[in-house]
Every structure is written in structure tokens, then in C-alpha cells.
Amino acid sequence: MSRAGRQLALLLCSCCVAVAIPGGLAEEGCPAEPHQASRYVAAVYEHQSFLSPDPLALTSREQALELMHRNLDVYEQQVTTAARKGAQIIVFPEDGIHGFNFTRTSIYPFLDFMPSPRSVRWNPCLEPHRFNDTEVLQRLSCMAMKGEMFLVANLGTKQPCHSSDPGCPSDGRYQFNTNVVFSSNGTLVDRYRKHNLYFEAAFDTPLEVDHTVFDTPFAGKFGVFTCFDILFFDPAVRLLQDSEVKHVVYPTAWMNQLPLLAAIQIQRGFAIAFVINLLAANIHHPSLGMTGSGIHTPLKSFWHHSMDSPEGHLIIAEVARNPPGLISAGNATGKTDPFHRKFLQLLAGDPYSEKDAQDVHCDAAPKSTTNASPTFNSEMMYDNFTLVPVWGRDGHVHVCAHGLCCHLLYQRPTVSQELYALGVFDGLHTVHGTYYVQVCALVKCGGLGFDTCGQEITEAMGMFEFHLWGNFSTSYIFPMLLTSGMMLETPDQLGWESDQYFLKKRGLSSGLVTAALYGRLYERD
């Protein structure tokens, strides 16, 4: 069984947000995890990149290099800062050097030639004239060597091909969205060519999936993938079937989409589900909805999300070489907790528990002509969700669609003048990508009308203590907890209980925006 599907767990730590300090550096805003000998220092940089004023226009290699060197100058400054803080690895975002929205032709001057690191051992900084059109690789190599750290960056690359190659494009070359990895001495260690392209006409999909893993002296094996890849089995999940891969470097250019797929939501959920450290570097263009980076462990996150700041942001954190595992759900069921005991009784089909749970206090809730909450449909994430309103101070509600039934057992210290709803979706998502999902989600609606449920919101006042669960038919389930002001929260407990996957949370730090269990059925894509 995958690590995502193992029995889960009581999470003992809270999330932490990276905070800015003078000089542009960001450090964790709460105490570090207990010190262990086997730890390393990681850095990710969210980059406000310099972009081509007209990415569709044809330009020269010299003009392209002028733009890219401006971005590389910023990278070099961040490597210097990270080195002073003891960073052993740094990750930069997707598209951070060259930008985006090119055509296949207009991006050509921005591409470096890319030899295969598996067949050619090369240090671009020390051997700059070995291959033509490698100026970007040379600078990145020199940064890694000067900073004495592993460096991961994303750039466009080209690879000539012959007409005898049945996959060779008509212009005689492959163009790839490529991550490169340099060791601390500047050697090109490996590359990853993006497999799941997201409307990227400038690039080709590799004929075979790269399953890129590189080894480090300070933390063992790291996997590599890019942006949209995180939603698919290949290469992301297949990489993690290697039990020795406990860390992932993840350049991304992610456009946030609430309520379920903000960058930090999926990053955090992925780290928890697979019990790994995820080093995620996003591009920073708030006007395009692009922000959200972090160093995520199974128990804690150091992250940055800002729609206001025009500046890039460096995050540095010390994390464990062996990410702390999750405590067995069987050892942490909290049977002495009356609220959790009621949840277990509901799973067991205790009719008295069901009666008690549905005894909803409706003093501040809309009146209904029936005892059951009305179901309704609303668009969320371009999908047709079936939902029920969550009214009153406490209760148990459930909603089903196509065999997936989602349940919510909840208590509220006070009832805010906001509408919340429990939603379910079990089907093929077909907008901006095609993939099969099973989702149970408690969301704050954009207004008081049912048709506002699923809208993008970031602020909320509603406080909850709850169990959220469903009869998922996949073991790949990503837990998501987001509160007011784009703050990440950690579940108190989550796991399998009586063939139901559940998430438990008490003591939110601020109003709930989204609590979700986001399941992927890769085989049904």
C-alpha cells in the first residue's frame, strides 16, 4: 500500500508561517522542531521575475540573455543570503528565469542546450566552452559552487533530433520545460523534463517520463517534478514508491484557485499524505494569482503567501533528514474524548448517537420546513458539487453523490452570520486538465445564498470543532485545512476508521475557509 494509504495519525505539531525580516530573508515564526543530529537546512525562493514585454515577439539570443541575466542576478543574491544562513539546498521556481506565454518559435532564443547528465559528466562553471548555448547553465553552476549548496532551478532547454526519430518535431528539435540539479561543487547532477504540461505550447512532452531522483550527502534521496505534475500519478506518485525518497524539490508556477487548490493547500496536503518533506518554490506574480511557496514537512509548514507584496521572498528552515512519521490512528483514537466517541458511535451505526448528533441547535440558523437539511447544487472548481448547508451550533450532516458519501460531525462555540456548506464531488474534472477526483469539503460560502457556495474567499470568522469523513475508494487522499488570511492548519488526527477516511480538528486559530479531503483516482483519468 502507498504511504498515502497507510493508517494515519495524530499530528502533534502546528503549522508555522515564514515571516519577513530585514534584508528580505524569511525565517520560521515559531520554534523549530526538536533538534536532531540528522537534519539539514533547506531554502526556497519565491521569485518576482522580470518578464519579456512581448513574449510572442521574435528576439535575438543576446536580448534573451539580457533578460535572463536580470533574473539570474536575483538568484545569485538569494544564494549568497541562503549560504550565510547555512542552507545546503535551494530551490527556485518554474519559469523564473525566462518567463511564460511564449510560442514555440518565440521561446527559442531563451533555450539552453541540454546534454544528458546521465551520459555526460559536466561542470558548466569549470568547463564553460564544452557546449554552445549554455550560458544559463553556466551561471547556475557557478552559483551552486560559490554557495557550496545543491541548487535546483527551472529553465527552457533544447535538444536536436533527426528526422529518422519518429517523435522528432518538424523543426528538428525538442524543446523541454526542464528542472536542473547542481551539486555543491557545481556539477550538473541530473535533469527532469516536465511531463504534465499545462497549456505550454512552447514545449514538448518527453516521449518517456523522467523519474528523476538525486542523492545528497546531507539528506539522502530527493525526487523532482514540476507544478501540474503534483496532481498526477506519473511521475509524482511513482517516484515516491521508492521508500528511500523522503524529500521532493518542486519548482512551480501555480495560479491559485480556491477553495480547494491554492498552491500552499496542495503542497501541504501532498507532504502530509506521502510523509515527505516538500520544498516548493512558486513564482510571485500576484496580479496573475501566482504566489504560495513553502518548506512542508508532515508535521509542520514554513510558508509564504502574499497577494500584496511586490517582492520575492526567501524561506529557510531546518528539517529532519527522516521526516517524522505519523502516530498510528489505533494508538490515538481519543476514546476518552466524548466528541470523538460520538464519531466512532456514528461509524458503528449507533442510532442513539445519530439522534443526539442531529439534535441541532438552530437558534441562529435559518428555519427549515423539514428536519433534514436541504441538498442543493453549486459550481465549485468548475465541477458540479452536491451540498448541504451547515446550520446551528452542532450536528451531524451528510451528503452523497455517485457512491461517495461525506459526513460532518461538528460543534461551534458561536454561530457566525456566515453560510457554510458540506459538499461532495465524485467524478471526472474536465476544465483546465482532465483528472478523476473524489472530494469531501466543508467550505465557507461567498455570501448567504446557496449559489455562492464554491466561490473563492480568503476571510472567514466561523470557528468549528469537527470530524469530516467519507467512504473513499482511493488511498490517495490529500488533507487540506485553510483558515482566514490564507493560514494553514494541521489536523489533530486523520486516517482510516471502519473503511471511512476521516479528518479531526479542534481549536482552529482563525475562521475556517476550507476543510477538505481531496482524493485522486489516477486509474480513472
Swiss-Prot record:
Q: Which residues form the CN hydrolase domain?
A: 54-333
Q: Which reaction does it catalyse?
A: biocytin + H2O = biotin + L-lysine; biotin amide + H2O = biotin + NH4(+)
Mainly localized where?
A: secreted
Q: Which UniProt keywords apply?
A: Glycoprotein, Hydrolase, Secreted, Signal
Which Gene Ontology CC terms are recorded? extracellular region
An annotated Gene Ontology molecular function: biotinidase activity
- The signal peptide, as residue positions, is 1-26
- Please list the residues that make up the active site: E94, K194, C227
State the superkingdom: Eukaryota
Q: What class of enzyme is it?
A: hydrolase
Give compartment(s): Secreted, Extracellular space
- What's the Enzyme Commission number for this chain? 3.5.1.12
The residues that carry sugar chains are N132, N185, N384
Which one GO biological process term can you cite for this protein? biotin metabolic process
What does the protein in this record do? Catalytic release of biotin from biocytin, the product of biotin-dependent carboxylases degradation.
Please state which protein family the record places this protein in: Belongs to the carbon-nitrogen hydrolase superfamily. BTD/VNN family.
Identification of the protein by name: Biotinidase
